């Protein structure tokens, strides 16, 4: 099985359940004003009293990954540290696993041709057997097969991701120029992740691997992570930020739109890393790939 370069099929999840109010005023102007500064602290869940804040250190290479608000008093978005490898992988892994039922069941609503095919199979079963009982069992069997193949493909995708960029985050994202990886820290725990990777050929930055721990959703953490990628792109003079996602939940798409992204189109023929493209897989597993773009400045 071949594993190509990582694609954003997430994010974000896929997994974002944040509040989705739009940025006030002109989005781009507000972002440009804030480009050199930390976004304001986000509200945190009640917790024990925090230790005194650490002393300020030198600015890391990402440009916006410096010291944030003290732990326990807000969410701090900062650059990834090597010791957080397993925590970041866990958040990514758990977020991707949520796609299995979402793709199998919710995702079916995005594919009317597949729904029609399944209805024809049920009708054919009744025409052949004349049994209402067997005909009623057909939808349950089809959904069971969708779950099986969704699980099979998504676990294969996870295997690819965990052995490519997510195998060594520091090497893949922190060392190459134009790339970075951030974590959201709340009360000393890593609760969210996001990555950025530059495409020098068209002077854009791709937002990747956005995911938030399910226990900490609803705190605008995903929005803060997305803003950090926008800051990074502006500070390094990239012209646009792009992302691709196979998210089924409407909440994820509303999140991207609240950050200022425009929906550029969708495709039903996207091949997820790890797919074998067998006939059964094509019949019981489908994803819709959405492309988003936020233009920061004209070239």
UniProtKB/Swiss-Prot annotation:
A single GO molecular function term of this UniProt record: L-aspartate N-acetyltransferase activity
Catalytic activity of the protein: L-aspartate + acetyl-CoA = N-acetyl-L-aspartate + CoA + H(+)
Residue stretches spanning the membrane: 118-138
A biological process term (GO) from this entry: acetate metabolic process
UniProt enzyme class: transferase
Pfam families documented for this protein: Acetyltransf_1
Domain N-acetyltransferase: 143-280
PROSITE patterns noted in UniProt: GNAT (PS51186)
Known regulation of activity: Aminooxyacetic acid (AOAA) blocks its activity in both cytoplasm and mitochondria.
Induction profile: By methamphetamine in brain, via dopamine receptor activation (at protein level).
Tissue specificity of this protein: Expressed in brain, kidney, liver and spleen. In brain, present in neurons but not in astrocytes (at protein level). Expressed in brain, thymus and spleen.
Statement: the UniProt record of this protein carries the keyword Transmembrane helix: yes
Family: Belongs to the NAT8 family.
Protein name: N-acetylaspartate synthetase
Gene name linked to the record: Nat8l
């Amino acid at each position: 099985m071949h594993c190509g370069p990582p694609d954003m099929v997430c994010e974000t999840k896929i997994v974002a359940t944040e509040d989705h109010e739009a940025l006030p005023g002109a989005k781009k102007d507000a972002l440009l004003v804030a480009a050199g500064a930390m976004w304001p602290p986000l509200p945190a869940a009640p917790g024990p009293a925090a230790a005194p804040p650490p002393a300020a250190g030198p600015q890391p290479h990402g440009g916006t990954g410096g010291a944030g608000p003290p732990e326990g008093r807000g969410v701090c978005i900062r650059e990834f540290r090597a010791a957080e490898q397993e925590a970041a992988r866990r958040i990514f892994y758990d977020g991707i696993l949520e796609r299995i039922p979402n793709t199998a069941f919710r995702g079916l609503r995005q594919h009317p041709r597949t729904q029609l095919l399944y209805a024809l199979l049920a009708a054919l079963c009744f025409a052949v057997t004349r049994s209402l009982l067997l005909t009623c069992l057909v939808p349950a069997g089809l959904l069971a097969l969708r779950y099986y193949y969704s699980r099979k493909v998504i676990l294969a995708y996870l295997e690819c991701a965990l052995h490519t960029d997510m195998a060594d985050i520091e090497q893949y994202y922190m060392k190459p120029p134009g790339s970075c990886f951030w974590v959201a820290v709340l009360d000393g725990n890593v609760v969210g992740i996001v990555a950025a990777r530059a495409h020098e050929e068209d002077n854009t930055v791709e937002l990747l691997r956005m995911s938030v721990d399910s226990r900490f959703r609803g705190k605008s953490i995903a929005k803060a992570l997305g803003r950090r990628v926008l800051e990074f792109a502006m500070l390094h003079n990239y012209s646009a930020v792009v992302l691709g996602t196979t998210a089924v939940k409407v909440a994820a798409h509303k999140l991207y739109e609240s950050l200022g992204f425009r929906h550029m189109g969708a495709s039903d023929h996207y091949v997820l890393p790890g797919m074998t493209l067998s006939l059964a897989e094509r019949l019981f597993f489908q994803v819709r790939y959405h492309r988003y773009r936020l233009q920061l400045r004209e070239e």
